Amino acid sequence: DRDGIDAALIKTDGYQVLEEGPFLTVPYKTAFRKLLENLIAGKGDLNKVEDQLTLEHAKAVSALIKNFNVAISDVDLIGFHGHTISHNPDKQHTLQIGNGGLLASATGVDVVNDLRSSDVKAGGQGAPLAPIYHKALMKSQDLPAIILNIGGVANITWADTLDENLIGFDTGPGNALIDDWIKKKTGRHYDNNGFLASQGQVHDCLLYTSPSPRDLRL
């Protein structure tokens, strides 16, 4: 999201998480956050910002392996989501900026990116992606299980088996819109520990009520 980059090392066979490695978060500088905000508003040089974002991710990869004494040759693959600029699956449209070729060149590691487009073009929602990872985590958990992920957009994953009964969908706005509101109303960057939210009341009429599976359109 616009806060920065989360980078993590995991060992996986593609079906389950075999080992959880180190992770770090690299905050974006205020000026770069503004560039992302401008792109979402339809302003700015998309290609220039995309390259800058990609190189910031390359720096995050470098910091991760350096801080935890990992050889880059031991990294087989980088999953690169990029940054969502617009998302409207009803019109078979989604756009995440991030140059996979540039990241591969900068790091020397193969990159998988543009993770949503094919699903959206095939008539899917393209979101959320988290349930795929949650399914891998659930292989070591007792079922049924529910995982709630509150990121920029909140989503939930539910499974009673690990066959075809995995359900995952967006539950509504997460920290992205909340952070924007907090910044506008208080000048702070976020609601620390949910203090302000805990003082409020739920407006049932404003809840996102369309049936699952669903995503939150941006």
Regions found by a protein language model. Give the residues of each.
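Short polar catalytic/cofactor-binding loops
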Residues: 1-3, 30, 215
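Glycine-rich phosphate-binding loop plus the immediately following alpha-helix
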Residues: 5-8, 22-38, 112-139, 146-207
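Glycine-rich nucleotide/cofactor/substrate-binding loop typically near the N-terminus or early
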Residues: 9-64
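A glycine- and small-aliphatic-rich helix-loop capping segment at beta-alpha/alpha-beta transitions
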Residues: 9-17, 91-102, 135-139, 160-166
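Short beta-strand-loop/turn "lid" adjacent to the catalytic site in phosphate-handling enzymes
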Residues: 44-100
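Glycine-rich phosphate-binding loop and adjoining helix at the ATP-binding site
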Residues: 76-131, 217
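Single conserved hydrophobic/aromatic residue that forms the stacking wall/gate
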Residues: 208-218
